Amino acid sequence: MAGWSCLVTGGGGFLGQRIVHLLLEEKDLQEIRVLDKVFKPEVREEFSKLQSKIKLTMLEGDILDEQCLKGACQGASVVIHTASIIDVVNAVGRETVMKVNVKGTQLLLEACVQASVPVFIHTSSIEVAGPNSYREVIQNACEEDRLETAWSAPYPLSKKLAEKAVLEANGWALQNGGTLHTCALRPMYIYGEGSPFIFAHMNKALENNGVLTHNSKFSRVNPVYVGNVAWAHILALRALRDPRKALSVQGQFYYVADDTPPQSYDDLNYTLGKEWGFCLDSRRSLPPSLRYWLAFLLEIVSFLLSPIYNYQPPFNRHFVTLCNSVFTVSYKKAQRDLGYEPLFTWEEAKQKTKAWVGSLVKQHKEALKTKTH
């Protein structure tokens, strides 16, 4: 195949960075374009080092800026769209989440048509499928089950609408007479080095003598390692660029998991942190039913105060459901259509993530020393 180029939106983020690193190994790839609203100095430095291996262009811009998207897509062969706002407690605001996640995706699809980009891979979310109730038990869900979120909370709704737009865009005519081929990947909860959620959990625990919060002991999910999610994106772009494989992949969505054992979010945090002295809170936590109704009351208070004050509840019903559900999926369809097999075993993923957690502990101790001197 002739030389090709790939645009990764949200490429400076947790998942996006891993996708960029894997793209470096792709055959005949001439340029990687990385679009993000802002690049952290350490990310910019890391990407600068990679420019000796391949042409890597960093583009700072807004996903809602049509001119920015038009320029970013010009001459690209593939778009991997990871950029989104992940907000499960409504901290950002409904309008912003819906604009970035839905309108941003629609504008990017339109830019692909104008620039005649034939391949579009969308990073969706498990929350497009659920869970809808903490009482509902869903195990080894597959794509044929056609599970769908019933939540009107901005994050799951925005991801559902964005994925719908992407899959409906499959088959669109491009400006040059070609055809747009799309697919969507629905990863489970993603963990690994650099995870913003694990970072927040561990830092909060470090400020509380190493005691991890106990919010989700009733959950049972199959988390997925970031390196394996990135690998699934590479396999998806290979499939959509291959005329023989594209027929079975275009317009499809895929669950992405790996061989990480099903467990609660609390257990995952403890597994990754116990070596460094972290422990679970021994105090009894509220049962999910009581926590759910407390969340409902807080949402009512927030609504009643909204004309005069922007009260942000610490949690909501959607978050309580997410943290207390049994919800696991199968990745057999990705195996069949994409040839997906995890690049990293559970043991490898665990060790890499634990080492990173250890570095956070070290940084915390050094920061404390600096304060005391």
From Swiss-Prot:
Reactions mediated catalytically: a 3beta-hydroxy-Delta(5)-steroid + NAD(+) = a 3-oxo-Delta(5)-steroid + NADH + H(+); a 3-oxo-Delta(5)-steroid = a 3-oxo-Delta(4)-steroid
Function according to Swiss-Prot or TrEMBL: 3-beta-HSD is a bifunctional enzyme, that catalyzes the oxidative conversion of Delta(5)-ene-3-beta-hydroxy steroid, and the oxidative conversion of ketosteroids. The 3-beta-HSD enzymatic system plays a crucial role in the biosynthesis of all classes of hormonal steroids.
Residues given in the record as NAD(+) binding sites: 159
Catalytic residue positions: 155
TM ranges: 292-309
A biological-process GO annotation: steroid biosynthetic process
Biochemical pathway: Lipid metabolism; steroid biosynthesis
EC code: 1.1.1.145, 5.3.3.1
Domain of life: Eukaryota
Record InterPro entries: 3Beta_OHSteriod_DH/Estase, Lipid_A_modif_metabolic_enz, NAD(P)-bd_dom_sf
Main location: endoplasmic reticulum
Family statement: Belongs to the 3-beta-HSD family.
Pfam family, one: 3Beta_HSD
Name recorded for this polypeptide: 3 beta-hydroxysteroid dehydrogenase/Delta 5-->4-isomerase
Cellular compartments annotated: Endoplasmic reticulum membrane; Mitochondrion membrane
GO cellular component assignments: cytoplasm; endoplasmic reticulum membrane; intracellular membrane-bounded organelle; mitochondrial membrane
Keywords, alphabetical: Endoplasmic reticulum, Isomerase, Membrane, Mitochondrion, Multifunctional enzyme, NAD, Oxidoreductase, Steroidogenesis, Transmembrane, Transmembrane helix
Gene Ontology molecular function terms on file: 3-beta-hydroxy-Delta5-steroid dehydrogenase (NAD+) activity; oxidoreductase activity, acting on the CH-OH group of donors, NAD or NADP as acceptor; steroid Delta-isomerase activity
Membrane-topology descriptor: Single-pass membrane protein
